[in-house]
Each structure stands twice: as structure tokens, then as C-alpha cells.
Amino acid sequence: MDAEYSGNEFPRSEGERDQHQRPGKERKSGEAGWGTGELGQDGRLLSSTLSLSSNRSLGQRQNSPLPFQWRITHSFRWMAQVLASELSLVAFILLLVVAFSKKWLDLSRSLFYQRWPVDVSNRIHTSAHVMSMGLLHFYKSRSCSDLENGKVTFIFSTLMLFPINIWIFELERNVSIPIGWSYFIGWLVLILYFTCAILCYFNHKSFWSLILSHPSGAVSCSSSFGSVEESPRAQTITDTPITQEGVLDPEQKDTHV
């Protein structure tokens, strides 16, 4: 009987040991699972706060606090500035072409209505050739001492009164010389520069007229900027206690258990 009792006692003791050991393991596994649950909750809270902050920043970027009229004016001002810069660049390139061009006059289609001596005809050809070479070559062909006093008159007469000079030259020499394509490109350059000046003038005028006519819009715009800057801070302050409560709740549950 003792042997049977002893033989039966060992299995019972082993079972009891297993029963005593299993609750400890279950507690450990439960604690580990609870810890992972805490981490999962923290990760979800952090991801949710990050997604909310990113959505708010995108909304703030898309929804500008400026009034609609200010935004339209700003877009038109930017387009006018880009257009004026492009036109000025094109005009400068054409101006270089005109300055170094040698086609101010079309000498191949020149006609003489009177027979001149050889020396006079040669002089007419040389003067017409110099005039057809453009402003820079015409300036280089003369000595600087002769043009020091009348430099301004020379430039003005060459650029602005070129057809009048040609017409006087044709009347004096009784000859007809057609004007070349460089002269017309020069007028195109002048028109482009006038267009740039008009765009810049109206751009500046409309901008300041809008600011002077709507002074309250600037105040409301600045106040809206301040509210937009303050709102993310307030939202972050309100979000932080939520995350702290989410972290502290599991510890309170452990104490209650």
C-alpha cells in the first residue's frame, strides 16, 4: 500500500507541479502580450498623430490665407514679370544683331538717275557702303576728334532719323537706295522695349493701387497668418495628453489587477 501510495503520489506531485508552473508561464506570456499591446497602441497613436499633422500641413499649403483678389493679382504680376523679362531678352538679342549687321541699306538695288563723273560716283558708293554697315562701323569710320562735340547728335540722327538722312542723301546725289532689313529689326527692338516698359509700369501701378485700396486686407491677412501658425501648436498641445493617457492606462490596469 505504501508503495502504491508512493507510486501514485509522484505523478500527482508532477501534475501539481505542472499546474503550479503553468499559471506562472501564463502570467509571463500575458505580461509579454500586454507589453506588446502597449507598444502597438503607442505605435498606432504616433502614426495617427503623424498622419494628422501631415494632413494639416497639406491643407494649410493648399488653402492659402490670402484673399482671392490678392492671389489673382499676384499670379498676374508674376506672369507679367516673366513676359517682360523674356521680351527684354529677345529685344537685346535683336539689338546685337542690328548693331553688328551690315544690311542697313540694300546696295544691290540702288539706282542712279544722273550720270556722275567717276570720282563722284565712287564717293557716293563709299558713303552708301559706310551707311549700310550700321552704327558701329559708321562710328569707327570717323575720327574721334571730329565726333567728340556732336556725338549725341550723331547717334540720334543715325538711329531715329536714319530714313531722313537717306532721303537727303538721295536728293543730293540723285540716287535711290532701298532700306535694308536691319532698319526694320531696329524698329521691332524699339517696340519690344516699349512693351516691356508698359508691362512693368502697369504691374507696379496695379500692385500699389491694390495695397492702398485694401489696407484692411493686409491686417486680416496677417491675423490669419498668426492664427494658422498658432493652431498647429495648440493642436500638438492637445494631442500630447492623449498620448500620455494612452501610455499610462495599461499601468493603471496592472495595479488594479
From Swiss-Prot:
Where is it chiefly localized? membrane
Gene Ontology CC, one term? membrane
Judging by the UniProt lineage, the source's domain of life is Eukaryota
Would the keyword Membrane turn up in this protein's UniProt record?
yes
Q: Which residues carry this modification: Phosphoserine?
A: S64
**Which controlled-vocabulary keywords does the entry list?**
Developmental protein, Differentiation, Membrane, Phosphoprotein, Spermatogenesis, Transmembrane, Transmembrane helix
Q: Where is the composition biased (Basic and acidic residues)?
A: 11-30
**An annotated GO BP:** cell differentiation
Q: Which residues cross the membrane?
A: 80-100, 152-172, 179-199
What is known about what this protein does? Component of the outer dense fibers (ODF) of spermatozoa which could be involved in sperm tail structure, sperm movement and general organization of cellular cytoskeleton.
Protein name (database record):
Outer dense fiber protein 4
Which organism is this protein's natural source? Homo sapiens
Q: What is the lineage of its organism?
A: Eukaryota, Metazoa, Chordata, Craniata, Vertebrata
